Amino acid sequence: MPLMGSLYIGASGLQSGQNALNTTAHNLTNIDTTGFTRQQTLLSSKRYITISKNPAAVSDQQYGIGVNLSAVRQVRDYFLDQTYRKESGRSMFYEASTDVLGEVENVLGELNGEDFQTSLSNLWTAIQELSKDPSSSVTQGLLVQRSAEFINRANAVYQDLTNYQDNLNKQIKEKVTTINQYGKQIQALNDQIRKIECGGIEHANDLRDTRNQILDELGKLCKMTYSEDSLGNVSVRIEDSDFVRGDLFYEIGLDASDATGFYTPFWIKDAEYTVLADGTKKYNIKGAEVFNLDQTVSSSLDTDIGGLKALLLARGDHRANY
């Protein structure tokens, strides 16, 4: 091998080592960055030069010309990503449900320093006393007093529960807005990643980190599945319906009930509509709802995934009439 060839081999090793050190420095710099994925440098040998061929020999006489930086890849596990996002969605479902139950317990148990059960027990005691002596003006007056107390407390409980329903309705609107924002961001990142990686030379690791972080957050809000194609596009489905497909984004709309003002998430792409005189669209969301709330909540059926679905179930679709 010529002297310059030997020097080139050494230079390629130094250059590849420098690239590996740069990757290590990048990992250390971003160790506390949310969503960052550790990167790994892959090295491979450059092509070999054949000196001579001998059919009787085990192999040809060759020598290498150095080492090459093959790729800088992310160290991620697709199976673990899918499992984490699914289970984080299930965790958020039960966390949201627990928060709602806790709030209802507070309304029933911490009303003005005295729980609702006390007023109910006092009313029942007054009725029992009246049954012993119906002609007694004292027991009659006590029943009237206890009844008034019970009605006042019942009205207060009803108002608190109604206000909490409105609060849940507001949270539902905010979460749908957040989901749509995530969809637009994934669509934009798909476009950027595709442009960078189309030449087969560069790998958009930092953009992929951002997209993976968005998928992590999206998995907490709803039941979603995703897949990546050969171009680097990630397609996302929510509740078995397309949400992002390549460079396409399908928005989730909100239909407000005329009677209650409660929002129902629906797929705009699947809903029929009529154009009103003022130019606005009136949607018919039948069959276009994002969530089927009639399904039995079950881990075996995967119907207990996503904080948004938990809020919809907790809020209900009507106001109670007590």
Segments from the language model and where they lie:
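Structural signature of extracellular appendage/secretion-system components
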Residues: M1-Y322
